[in-house]
Structures are given as structure tokens and as C-alpha cells.
Amino acid sequence: MKVLIIGGGASGLMAALSAAEEGYAVTLVERQGRVGRKLLATGNGRCNLTNTGADSPRYHGAAPAFVRPALARFGVRRTLEFFRTLGLLTVEEADGKVYPLSDQASSVLDVLRFAVEQRGVRIAGSCDIVEVKKKARGYEAIAATGEKFFGDKLIICCGGCAGKRLGGVKSGYFLLGQLGHRCTALYPCLTQIKTDPTWVKALKGIRADAQLSLRRGGAVLQEEAGEIQFTDFGVSGPVAFALSRAAATGGEGLRLVLDFFRGYGAPELAAFFRARRESFPALPAEELLSGSLQSRLGKTLLKRAGVAAGGTLGAVTDAEIEKLCNLAKHFPLEVLGVMGFDSAQVTAGGMDVSEFRADTLESCLAPGVFAAGEVLDIDGDCGGFNLQWAWSSGYVAGKAGKIEAI
């Protein structure tokens, strides 16, 4: 049987290896000159290839439970065993994140490329597929150059439109659309959040530990804690990335509320700053937060709280301290949106999973067509979850309808 795979990213490479393992004749068509380019950029060049906590609650979309059969069939344990057989050693870090022992994403791509070559997979690079057609037997894919490819089974692994610089495109959505499939709304995900720049411009480049709450009115939509980084347009860092999906899909009227003292209550903070005022009354007022926060961040809080910069600590009133503490615990920023697909790591949304079988990833509309990875309406949390979905779904799709005992 001939298997044709369109897309040479993580899910496409896994699908190729999985299909070749069955003895199928596999052709992998990739739009770019080389396969796996996005892998080299994951995890800041380290490749966070999975997470030991990968399970359906860490995934999103219209039907997150869709991931369960694939994760049960080829989960974290089997993924790590698979990579070990290819010659890759790994190390588990905080929060269940797994990286190659070499600390280099190139190690992951290398072992995949070597395995693909060894198993006889034909790779057609620099080949942009623009059309797929159902034939009397199987499917035909036509490139922009006019070149044609055939497969008894067709697997679409084109990924999403995030990370355009690294090859993110919408081609997978268009190709599956030609076969009758529906695409949901698409949003940039795992990216920076844009806010009103009034108070963040002066903080550009500053890193801080904080709790971030995404809110609409009095309702908290999502809350995360950890390191953030201010930019001239808003907030970045792992915590902002974790909130970006909700910020992208949540519509208007959203705001971020930052807590820079998440280990302390406002009354405790107020008592601490009153004691500092009494101990050092002659110090400039702008030094009130100098032992607690980065200098520019502290001065921004003082300015927003209305504490006069030219005075002394002794002149700061109890009311000003109370206002400052409330602001330090509830620093509001109006959300203007998120950065676009160029900056995003993942696409939220994709092909409607109700039109695919969860156990095989075969199309319910076009028998013999399968889809895997980011092209489907599944996206995971930051921390290796999206790559695990790529491995799991690629493996299952590569079996081309063959169901193994779990």
C-alpha cells in the first residue's frame, strides 16, 4: 500500500515512521527545503518534546476529549521509548517537561531524519501541494509546479498557521476543505498579550514574578502564576503565553490584573511599608519599594499610586501606602488582544474534529484520508503538550486505519 503524507513537521515525520513500520511505501511531501524546521525552534532551541502530565485536561478545542484515544495508544511512555530506540536520551525537568539530554533541538530532528532515511521513506522537499483529488483508487496530490503524487491513503500533517517565519501555513485547512471538511475559527495561541501601553512602555525588558488574572468584569476567566516579562506593547513570558488562548478567544472587555506580591496579603504589605517608613524617614519616597521590586517597576507603581517622587518616606501617608499595596496586589492592564500568527507558537482552532474518527484519525467524509497534529482543532498548554499531540496523532494516523491492541 502507498501512503502519501503532506507536511514534514513533527506529526508528519512520526506518521512517516509509523507507516513505514507497517511496511507501507511512504512518500513525504514538504513545502520547505528541509523537514522538521519548526522543531529546531521549540523550547527556545532545546525542544521540549513532551510532558509527563500529558492528558486531555491539558488540551483545548471544541472537543478536547478527542485526544484521549491517541494518547492512550501512543502516550508519553511509548513516545520516550520510541525516541530511545532511535538513539535519543532525555531528561525530565520541572513541571514534567522532557528535553533531549543534549539540550539541543537538533538532536531530536537528527534521530528522526536518520530513521526516516533508514526506513526508506521518500522525501520530496520544496514542494507546495495546492490541490488534492479523490481518484477511483486512492488520492492524488498536485503541486504548484504541476508535479503529481499518489497515495492509497492520504495523511494531512501540514500544521497550523502559527510561526509563519518557520513555515506556518494554512495549506492543510485548504486541502482538507477541498475534501469537504470544515475549519473552525483560527486564533494565535501561546503568544504575547497586548495591553494598553500607558504603564508598560516604561517597564520594557523587566522580568518579574507575578500572578496574572484574566478577567471580564468581576469574573476571573483564568489565572496563572510565574515569570512575566514586560514589552513595549504588553506582557510576555510563560505565564502570559498560558493566558493567551483565553485572551485571543475571549472577545472585548478583558483586562489583566497582576499581583506582584502573591505571597503576601495587602494588610501584611501595608504593615511592612509603614515599618520601613518609620525606620528610614529621610530616604527618598521612591525608595519605598527598593527592597521588594526591581527599581523601574517600583517607581512605576509609586507613580500610578500617586506617591510624590520628590518627597521622603516620612512624608508618605497611611492612605498612600494602602493605595500602593492595593495597586501592587491588583495592577490592572486593559487587554487589547494578542500578537499575531507570526509570533505565536501554536494555532488555536483547526479542522472540526467531529468529522474525524478519534481512534484512527480517519476522515468520516473522505475514507482513506487522515489528519494529524496542529491542523486539527486541538491545541495544548505550553510545556511540551503540543509536541506530544503531534507524536501521538502522527503515530495513529500513520497506521492508516490499523488498530492495535492497547
Summary of predicted features, one role per range:
Residues 44-92:
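Glycine-rich active-site loop/strand segments that organize a redox cofactor
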Residues 2-28, 397-402:
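N-terminal Rossmann-like FAD-binding beta1-loop-alpha1 element of flavoenzymes
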Residues 153-199:
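Glycine-rich loop(s) and the adjacent beta-strand/alpha-helix scaffold that form part
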Residues 124-125, 298-379:
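A glycine-rich dinucleotide-binding beta-alpha-beta segment and adjacent secondary-structure elements
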Residues 33-35, 40-41, 49-56, 89, ...:
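An anion/pyrophosphate-binding glycine-rich loop and adjacent beta-alpha core
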Residues 4-6, 29, 129, 148-165, ...:
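Short hydrophobic core segments
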Residues 125-138:
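A conserved short coil-to-beta-strand element within the FAD-binding core of flavoproteins
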Residues 20-44:
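Glycine-rich FAD pyrophosphate-binding loop
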